[in-house]
From Swiss-Prot:
Segment forming the signal sequence: none
Region entry Involved in Mg(2+) ion dislocation from EF-Tu, spans: 82-85
Compartment list: Cytoplasm
Primary location recorded for the protein, binned into one broad class: cytoplasm
Lineage: Bacteria, Pseudomonadati, Pseudomonadota, Gammaproteobacteria, Pseudomonadales
UniProt key word Cytoplasm: yes
NCBIfam families for the chain: tsf
Top-level taxon of origin: Bacteria
Function: Associates with the EF-Tu.GDP complex and induces the exchange of GDP to GTP. It remains bound to the aminoacyl-tRNA.EF-Tu.GTP complex up to the GTP hydrolysis stage on the ribosome.
Name of the featured protein: Elongation factor Ts
SUPFAM superfamilies xref list: Elongation factor Ts (EF-Ts), dimerisation domain, UBA-like
Residue spans crossing the bilayer: none
Species annotation: Pseudomonas aeruginosa (strain LESB58)
Length: 289
C-alpha cells in the first residue's frame, strides 16, 4: 500500500474542503490515489456536504429524552438551514438517533456526539442539500428531573430537589413561555445589572434630566428591582396561576428548584439576510450541481 504523506493529505484537503482525517481516510481507502479518492468522496456526497458547511444553519429542532425514573434527561439542538427540512423524516431520524446515542452514552458535551455522528451528518447533507449541525447538548441529573417540549423549537429541562415529575414539567412549561434569564437574583451578575442600568438611563434621559440625584437613584433602584423580578425564575408569576410566584409554587410542594436549561432553535445565531430573488436564484443553482 502506498504511503500516505502529509503533502497528499494537504492537497486533497485543499481540493475538496474536507477535514484532514477524512482526507487521510479517503486516501488510505484509495491506495494513495488522489484522483480516485476525490471520485470516491464525490460519489459518497462528501464534497457536496463540505461545500454546504459554509451555509448558515439557524433553523432546526430541539429534542429531549428523559429517564423513566425522572432522574436524568438530555436536551440537544440540531440545526438545519430551513424549517422545512426540520419537519422532514430524514432530519427527524437523524435528530432522534443522535439524541438516543447522547442519552445512552451519558454524554455531557456535544463534541463527542458531533464526532460520532459525522458520517451520518454528511450523508444527510448530501441527500438534502442543506447544511446540518449538531450545535449543543446538556445532560441534567438530579432528584426529580422534568422536561417540556414546545413543538420542535423550544425545549426545557428542570431539576428539582424534592417535588414530583408533574411539578417539574409544569415549571418547565413556565420556563418555555416566560424565558427567565436566571434562577434567582443571586445568580444575576454585576455586569448584567450595570448593563440594565445603562439601558434604563439611556431610554429615560429626557425624564431624568434636571432631577435631583437621589430621585434618579431611586428610579434606577426601582427599575433594577423590576428587572431582577422579571429575569429570575423564582420571582416570576406562575403562568398557570399568576397569583403565585414560581419559587413559592415549588416550596408549597416541598421542592426546591436546583437548575433549569432552556434551548430555543437558533438563539444566538446570526442569520444571513438574503433577498427573495437571490434565495430563488441560489436554489435554482443548487439543483444544477
Amino acid at each position: 500500500m502506498a504511503e500516505i504523506t502529509a503533502a497528499m493529505v494537504k492537497e486533497l484537503r485543499e481540493r475538496t474542503g474536507l477535514g484532514m482525517m477524512e482526507c487521510k481516510k479517503a486516501l488510505t481507502a484509495a491506495g494513495g490515489d488522489i484522483e480516485k479518492a476525490i471520485d470516491d468522496m464525490r460519489a459518497a456526497g462528501a464534497i457536496k456536504a463540505a461545500k454546504k458547511a459554509g451555509n448558515i444553519a439557524a433553523e432546526g429542532s430541539i429534542a429531549v429524552k428523559i429517564a423513566a425514573d425522572n432522574k436524568a434527561a438530555v436536551i440537544i439542538e440540531v440545526n438545519s438551514q430551513t424549517d422545512f427540512l426540520a419537519l422532514q423524516d430524514d432530519f427527524k431520524g437523524f435528530v432522534a438517533e443522535s439524541l438516543e446515542k447522547a442519552f445512552n452514552e451519558k454524554l455531557t458535551d456535544a463534541a463527542p456526539l458531533v464526532e460520532a455522528r459525522e458520517e451520518a451528518r454528511l450523508a444527510l447533507v448530501a441527500k438534502t442539500g442543506e447544511n446540518v449541525n449538531i450545535r449543543r447538548l446538556t445532560r441534567v441529573e438530579g432528584d426529580v428531573v422534568g422536561a417540556y417540549l414546545h413543538g420542535h423549537r423550544i425545549g426545557v429541562v428542570v431539576n428539582l430537589k424534592g417535588g414530583n415529575p408533574e411539578l417539574a414539567k409544569d415549571i418547565a412549561m413556565h420556563v418555555a413561555a416566560s424565558n427567565p434569564q436566571f434562577l434567582n437574583a443571586s445568580e444575576v451578575s454585576e455586569e448584567a445589572i450595570a448593563k440594565e442600568k445603562e439601558i434604563f438611563l439611556a431610554l429615560n434621559a429626557d425624564k431624568i434630566a434636571g432631577k435631583p440625584e437621589n430621585i434618579v437613584e431611586n428610579m434606577v433602584k426601582g427599575r433594577i428591582s423590576k428587572f431582577l423580578a422579571e429575569a429570575s425564575l423564582v420571582e416570576q408569576p406562575f403562568v398557570k396561576n399568576p397569583e403565585v410566584k414560581v419559587g413559592d409554587l415549588a416550596k408549597q410542594a416541598g421542592a426546591e428548584i436546583v437548575s433549569f436549561v432552556r434551548y430555543e432553535v437558533g438563539e444566538g445565531i446570526e442569520k444571513a439576510e438574503v433577498d427573495f430573488a437571490a434565495e430563488v436564484a441560489a436554489q435554482v443553482a443548487a439543483t444544477k450541481q
